Each structure stands twice: as structure tokens, then as C-alpha cells.
């Protein structure tokens, strides 16, 4: 039973060993000369404007949550589409209810004005 998982275990062990060796060798061999320029934040080749400790609008978080919901929707729709023919009418009805609930949620968010920027 465990023999089937042996290749995966070996692959994980090799990945962990490689990662740890990379960290150890880079800390031993790498240069340790910090300077003001090296410690400055880097932003797309431009000088950073303002502080990184600013507050963000709640709208950004709402959009992020909607994006996560969209990703979860895609995660549920993909296996359903792969097994579409095997699930039969019950699977179609179940996914239809799921899509309707999501659609109602998106309409609610839209009507509340969460997607509008002012």
C-alpha cells in the first residue's frame, strides 16, 4: 500500500533537500554587504512614492473576495464539466442551482454598488 506513494515521497524529499541546500549555500557563499541602495524598496524600476504603510479602501478587499469566489466557482465547474455525461440530470440540476445562487450573489453585489468606483 505504501509502495505506491514511494515515488512521491522521494520527490518531496529531493525537493526539500534541494531547497534547504540552496538556502544554506546562498547564505554561506553570498555577499553580506548591505547598503542604503540595496535596502531600499524596489518598485518596477521607479522610485517608490509614499509609504508602504498606507490604508487601502475597503473596495479593494471586496473585489479580492469576489475574485476568490470566482476562483472557487471555476474550481467547482471544472470537474463538473469533465464528468458532465456521467452525472446525468441530477448533476445538471445541482450545478444549475449552484450557478443560480452565484448569479444572485453577483447581482446583489452589483446592485449594492460594490463594483462601482467613485
Swiss-Prot record:
InterPro entries: NAD(P)H_OxRDtase_bac/plastid (IPR023043), NADH_UbQ/plastoQ_OxRdtase_su3 (IPR000440), NDAH_ubi_oxred_su3_sf (IPR038430). It is found in: Cell inner membrane. One of its GO terms (molecular function) is quinone binding. The keyword Cell inner membrane applies. Its EC number is 7.1.1.-. Its main location: membrane. It comes from the Bacteria. GO terms for cellular component: NADH dehydrogenase complex; plasma membrane. NDH-1 shuttles electrons from NADH, via FMN and iron-sulfur (Fe-S) centers, to quinones in the respiratory chain. The immediate electron acceptor for the enzyme in this species is believed to be ubiquinone. Couples the redox reaction to proton translocation (for every two electrons transferred, four hydrogen ions are translocated across the cytoplasmic membrane), and thus conserves the redox energy in a proton gradient. This is NADH-quinone oxidoreductase subunit A 2. The gene is nuoA2.
